[in-house]
Amino acid sequence: MPESITPIAAAAPASRALLADGAEQVFWETASTTEFETPVDREMFQWRYFGYYLEREPELLFVATEGDTVLGYICGVADTRAHRELYEVAPHVAVFDDLYDRYPAHLHINLTAASRGRGLGGRLVASLESAVAARGAGGMHLVTSPGARNVRFY
């Protein structure tokens, strides 16, 4: 069965809940941090990198599926500065504030290990790029680190 990419906000309510659950499962499967001092720390980590986008910008959360299986997702915002709450929950957001005139949009993307290397990540990025461009974003940024497994992808 071929892969499909669905904006979560466009899915029927029952499907949307299943897609959100599947995307959150991918989030935890691929998370760079898996151990937390407290349950609140774990919740904040999830909120910072996934839950915020699901709640605040569902139109910019795209889920890749094959049949009923969620393979990955991409989420983001078209204008980082318009999301002031991110400055509070993710302090690193303020570090790059001087770049947001040129690159206002940002993203988070995660794919299961089995779905990498098939072009799906590029298709997810293209979906989000089109959506943020339609909202007037002239550029998109992301943050990673030199040793991260995603460097080669970007």
Predicted regions and their residues:
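Hydrophobic alpha-helical core bundles mediating ligand binding, dimerization, or RNAP-core interactions
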Residues: 20-31, 45-49
